[in-house]
A protein has these predicted regions:
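Residue-level detector of alpha-helical recognition elements and their boundaries
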Residues: 67, 156, 228, 262-263
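Surface beta-strand/loop "capping" patches
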Residues: 257-271
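N-terminal catalytic cores of secreted or lumenal carbohydrate-active enzymes
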Residues: 1-111, 115-129, 135-136, 152-153
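Catalytic-core region of carbohydrate-active enzymes that cleave or remodel glycosidic bonds
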Residues: 102-105, 109-112, 130-255
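Secondary-structure capping and boundary motifs in well-ordered enzyme cores
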Residues: 74-81, 188-192, 240, 271
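Intrinsically disordered, low-complexity segments enriched in polar/charged residues with Gly/Pro
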Residues: 69, 75, 101, 188-189, ...
Length: 271
């Protein structure tokens, strides 16, 4: 689509953000295919990850640092984290993740590893991965949730009981999905946005556990979308922020510094 790692790193630099590339771990999207790369053929994929770190951070006398400099950016991009796999799951994923993690930590111990917890925030697959990834001491467990507004309202206290030690949480993809029978332009509504806002109170209250979060997807064209709802809609003349965008803006521009307890009938309220 005309956006490679170089352009992505430049974009992050321009807007003052930290880049977080997510790399293929040798497994196809498990929604669509069971294809995977055999373990004895995984080395090229691992080398791609190592080369990417060198491209982002390496001195100009390294192979990939020299290529970056030749492209016009001699200074390093200061990459600090990398994701291995997206919504992958099962023992096959853990096996491949272990190989990536060993190689990356051996050569670049300062790079943080973000690992997938699959497609769902509950169930046997999630429980298996959550336990396995924490045993591996990955830096972040990437949790995704596309759920109805009621789920977000009832899960504002989800992270209250999470352990404060070990792997942190990256809420890497989330959005409240209202009635699927609604047209695309009506799925970004205040019901969804308010439930996300309530859920975010729990993330902010547990910021020592959930250290990163990102709504998804970010952009969609009103006449050429594949997924809805989306945070920002565009046409050839306008950019329209959804109700969910207003929630993201509210939290981005008004960072909380204190958690104030609210109780009803002697019980602490959340969400």
């Amino acid at each position: 689509f005309g956006l490679g790692f170089f352009e992505y790193f430049q974009l992050a630099e321009d807007i003052g953000a930290k880049p977080l590339p997510i790399l293929n771990c040798g497994m196809a999207c498990q929604f669509n295919s069971a294809e995977l790369v055999p373990m004895d053929q995984l080395d090229p994929y691992i080398q791609d990850a190592l080369d990417l770190v060198e491209f982002a951070n390496g001195d100009t006398n390294t192979v990939w640092g020299k290529k970056r400099a030749a492209m016009g950016h001699a200074a390093p991009f200061n990459l600090t984290m990398i994701g291995i796999g997206n919504e992958n799951c099962g023992p096959q994923y853990v096996e491949r993740l272990q190989a990536f993690t060993k190689a990356i930590r051996s050569k670049y111990p300062g790079i943080q590893i973000i690992a997938s917890s699959g497609t769902d925030p509950v169930g046997e697959r999630f429980d298996f991965l959550n336990q396995s990834l924490r045993a591996m001491q990955v830096d972040f467990v990437d949790e995704h949730y596309y759920r109805k507004p009621d789920w977000f309202l009832s899960n504002a206290s989800r992270y209250d009981a999470y352990t404060r030690n070990g792997s942190k949480v990256f809420a890497g993809e989330y959005a409240a999905h209202s009635d699927s029978k609604q047209t695309a332009e009506k799925r970004n509504n205040w019901q969804a946005a308010l439930s996300e806002a309530a859920f975010l109170t729990g993330l902010e209250r547990n910021a020592d556990v959930v250290q990163m979060a990102s709504y998804a997807p970010l952009f969609a064209h009103v006449e050429g979308w594949q997924w809805n709802p989306d945070l920002i809609w565009v046409n050839n003349q306008q950019v329209i922020g959804s109700a969910s965008y207003q929630v993201q803006k509210l939290y981005a521009l008004n960072k909380g510094t204190h958690a104030v307890a609210i109780s009803r009938n002697g019980a602490v309220m959340a969400g």
